């Protein structure tokens, strides 16, 4: 959203769906930072759940802005990153925030790291890797690292979005 509010990218519907699926009351907080949003999270009791609005509505998020991260940190006592797929991004909510809170890897992150270690450490041979994704540029370093370790390397990279069926 390039730092601008976009109703189609709002997390409000996610909060509503999460509440319905979990049978929990989910407090949706429409503004991620500021005194009012922090006051709401500070009033929470054990077992209550809140969801902040999409952080990418703030340019500071993707800029890994320390002041923004410090404002986000005001909501919490610890930071747990359980999103292995986003761990490579240096954003305020995934990187800079760890300067202001004790930071831990969550159970899914730990499992992913253990699997990666097993695959790259001393795996049973032959070894094949399947690497996919939309951004070729973000895969170059990974591919260069994997090539000497693999007998087979398959790369599925989405190059473009066709506007009409290809036949």
Regions found by a protein language model. Give the residues of each.
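Active-site loop-to-helix "anion-binding N-cap" substructures in soluble metabolic enzymes
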Residues: 1-160, 164
């Amino acid at each position: 959203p390039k730092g601008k509010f976009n109703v189609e990218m709002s997390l409000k519907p996610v909060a509503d769906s999460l509440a319905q699926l979990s049978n929990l009351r989910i407090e949706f907080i429409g503004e991620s930072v500021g005194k009012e949003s922090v006051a709401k999270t500070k009033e929470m009791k054990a077992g209550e759940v809140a969801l902040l609005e999409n952080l990418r509505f703030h340019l500071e998020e993707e800029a890994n802005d320390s002041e923004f991260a410090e404002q986000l940190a005001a909501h919490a006592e610890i930071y747990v990153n359980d999103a292995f797929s986003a761990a490579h991004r240096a954003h305020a909510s995934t990187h800079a925030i760890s300067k202001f809170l004790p930071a831990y890897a969550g159970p899914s992150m730990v499992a992913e790291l253990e699997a990666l270690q097993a695959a790259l450490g001393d795996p049973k041979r032959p070894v094949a890797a399947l690497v996919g994704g939309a951004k070729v540029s973000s895969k170059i370093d990974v591919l260069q690292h994997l090539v000497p370790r693999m007998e087979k390397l398959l790369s599925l990279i989405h190059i473009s979005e066709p506007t009409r069926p290809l036949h």
